[in-house]
Amino acid sequence: MNKKLIALGLSVLTAITLLTGCAGEKKEAAAPPVKDLKVTYVKSPLNIPSIVDKNNQTLVKEFGKDKISVTFPEINSGAKQTEALASGSLDVCSALGGTSAILAASNGVDVKVVGIYSRAPKAFNIIVKDPAIKTAADLKGKKVVGPKGTILHQILVAALNKEGLKPEAVNFVSLGIPAGVNALLNDDADAALVAGADVLRAQKAGARVLCNGEGLVDATIVIGVSGKLLKEHPEVVKKYLAIHQQNIDFMNKEQEKAFGFTAKETGLSLDEVKIMAPWYDFSTRITDKDIKDLEETQDFLLAMGMQKNKIDIKSLLAEVK
C-alpha cells in the first residue's frame, strides 16, 4: 500500500513539474504582420524594371492582394538608402550600388543582398573634351570630377591602375554627376565621371567617352533588404523578388512599351533609350563573377581609406527560400 502511495505521489509530482516547466517556457512572440512595405524608387541611370513597375503598378497590385500597401521613397543616394534602412524607415533598397551595400554592412547596418539589380559596365564612363587626352594615362595631373566612393570612382581608379598610375596622380574633386558634366562642359574640369543619360547629354555638347567600366569593373548594382525583414518575413522578400522578375519579363516581352515608359520617365528620346538599354544586364541571380566583383569593390574601398572594417562578402549575401 505504501509503495502504491509513494508511486502515485511521484507521478503527481512529475506531472506538476512538467506542467510548471511548460508554463515557464517563454515562446518567442511572432513578428507582427507586414502592413506597409517601403521600397525605394530609383530610375537612374536607366533602371527600366523599376520604371515598368511604376507604370504598371505591379508591386502595388500584387502586394495589395495580401493587404500590404507599398510606398516608394525616392532616394537616389546609396548612403541615404542604407541610412533609411538602418533607421527602419525603409525595407527594400531596390537598386543599391555595391559600394554602398558593402560600406553599410561594414559599419554595422543590418543589410542583406538578396539579388543583383543590374550589371552595366558600359553605362559608367569617364568623359573628356580635350582631344589630347587619349588614354587614362593622359589624365595625370588633370582635374577629374565625379561622385566619390561610387562605382564611377572605382572605374577611375581601375583605369589609372591599368596605366600604372596611383589615384593621387589626378586632382580628384567630388561632385555629383550633373554638376560634373557642367564643370567639364564649362572647362572647369578636364574629365568627368558620368553614368546613364548624362553621358548622352555630354556627348551632344561635344564631349566624348575616354573609357567605361568594360574590362575594369562590372558596375554591380544590388537589391538590398533589411536583415530584420528577411529574418521575420522571408515570404515577403521572396514575393518581392518574384514581382521584380515579372517587371523584367514585361520589359523583355513588351519592349516597345517598356522603352516608351522609360523615355517618358527620363526625358530621353525613344532612340536614346534603345541605344542605352543593351548596356544593362538585369539578371537577378548572384553569380560567382558577381561575388568576385563585390570583393574587388571592397578592396577598392579599403585601399581608398573609405572603409575601415573588412567584411566577408559572402556573409552579406542571403539566399531567399
Q: What feature does the model see in each segment?
A:
Residues 32-37, 62-74, 89-91, 162-174, ...:
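A local structural motif
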Residues 51-68, 153-172, 203-204, 260:
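Ligand-binding cleft/hinge of the Venus flytrap
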Residues 99, 169-173, 178-262:
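Pocket-lining segment of extracytoplasmic ligand-binding domains
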Residues 30-31, 128-143, 231-235:
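Flexible hinge/capping segments at coil-to-helix
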Residues 36-55, 149:
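Extracytoplasmic "Venus flytrap"
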Residues 232-306:
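Secondary-structure end/capping motifs
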Residues 1-36, 321:
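Short, low-complexity disordered leader/linker segments with a strong preference
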Residues 47-53, 73-110, 122-136, 154, ...:
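Pocket-flanking alpha-helical
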